[in-house]
UniProtKB/Swiss-Prot annotation:
GO molecular function: DNA binding
InterPro entries from the UniProt entry: SfsA, SfsA_C, SfsA_N
UniProt-recorded name of the protein: Sugar fermentation stimulation protein homolog
Family annotation (HAMAP family): SfsA
Organism lineage string: Bacteria, Pseudomonadati, Pseudomonadota, Gammaproteobacteria, Vibrionales
Pfam families: SfsA (PF03749), SfsA_N (PF17746)
Family: Belongs to the SfsA family.
Organism the protein comes from: Vibrio atlanticus (strain LGP32) (Vibrio splendidus (strain Mel32))
PANTHER family for the chain: SUGAR FERMENTATION STIMULATION PROTEIN A
Amino acid sequence: MHFNPPLEPATLIKRYKRFLTDIQLPDGSERTIHCANTGAMTGCATPGNTVWYSTSDNAKRKYPNSWEISETDKGHRICVNTARANQLAVEAIENGTIVELLGYNALRTEVKYGSENSRIDILLEDNEKPPCYIEVKSVTLLDEQVSTKQQISTKQQASTEGQGFFPDAVTTRGQKHLRELTEMVESGSRAVLLFTVLHSGIEKVSAAHHIDAKYSLLLKQAQDAGVEVLCYKAELSSTQIQLKQAVEFINS
C-alpha cells in the first residue's frame, strides 16, 4: 500500500470524540484531522508524540486529513487507521506474501456468513477445495510487562520483549467472530484468524487474557476446533505500508 502523496508529520495534541484528533503542524499552526479508530489505542495516542497523516482529494470530506501512523518516543511506528488492516491483508494474499493462503482462484470481501449475522472480511474460493473464511484483526498493543502463561511455565528469560497482544479492550464483536469461525470449520470449511501486526516493536502475538479472558478462551477453543491463526508483521514508512513477514503466535 503506497501513500501518494506521502504522509506528512505533525505533533499530537489530543484525541477526542472517538473520531477526531487535534495536531500541531511543523509551522506551529493547529489542525483537526479524522481518526479512523474507535478502540482504546493504548500506547498509540500519547500527546506530544509524532503522528503521520494522509490527505484525501475528496472535496466533500469535512476533515480531509486522516491519522495513519503514530511514532512513539522509542521510535516505534504504529498504524492506527483500522481500515488499513483489511486492505493490507488483501494485498498480501494477492501478491503471495501470505504463503499459507496461496492456491485459491477467487477472493471476495465483506461476505455475509455465520449464524450471528456477520460479514467475513475475506473469503477465498476454489473449485478444488473448501472455501476459506478469513477474519482480519489489527494488533497494535505492545506490552512488555505482561507474560503469557506459556512464558511463565517455561521460565523464559526476557521473553516479554516485543510481546504484542490482542485485543486492547474487551471485544464482544471479536468474540462473536471466533464463534462463527469455529462454526465454519465444523461445517467443513477452512477458517483463519489473521493478525496483521501494525506496530514495529511487536515480534510475537498472544491473546490478551488479562484484558478479555472470554476472548482468550474462545480463541483457544477455536484453535482446538481447527481454526488456524496466522500473524504477519508490517513494515511502515511515510510512503508505504506492507505486510512482510510471519511472526509467532504464542497460545497463552
